[in-house]
């Protein structure tokens, strides 16, 4: 499993996750062009990305999602509670690319488990598991709960 934090903070959040040939971005809070530049800087073409996973609706997490998904025809995955706040913000994401889930799901050999995070809007962290490796990504954590630990 390979994880690269491309951006973190109030100016934008983007994390690259790769496992068994599947490549995802968790949030795209930068512009499409800036995200593309940061991917290129670490030797990754945006054409290699298989999808986008969204933690929540704030602009520092979704700023580039609409254009990036549209430009590269990528699916966008988000928990059903998160999609409620995204419908009016992600108008360029094709209907067939809107992937709504309410629990653990699998993509290839990767198992993705969402867990709710305390925040002022519906927000989720994700645990990514593949074979004997696991990593969790949590952003905008209001406070640590027993569930998160």
Show where each model-derived region lies.
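Conserved beta-strand hairpin/beta-sheet module of binuclear metal-dependent hydrolase folds
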Residues: 1-42, 124-139
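Localized chelating/binding microdomains
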Residues: 1, 9-13, 17-18, 22, ...
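Active-site metal-binding motif and surrounding structural segment of the metallo-beta-lactamase
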Residues: 32-79
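Short active-site segment of divalent metal-dependent hydrolases/proteases
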Residues: 59, 122, 143
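Short amphipathic alpha-helix with an adjacent loop that forms part of the alpha/beta core around
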Residues: 39-43, 105-109, 149
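Metallo-beta-lactamase
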Residues: 79-132
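Fold-independent oxyanion-binding glycine-rich loops
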Residues: 8-9, 28-29, 79-80, 101, ...
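Short amphipathic alpha-helices and their capping/turn segments at secondary-structure boundaries
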Residues: 142-149
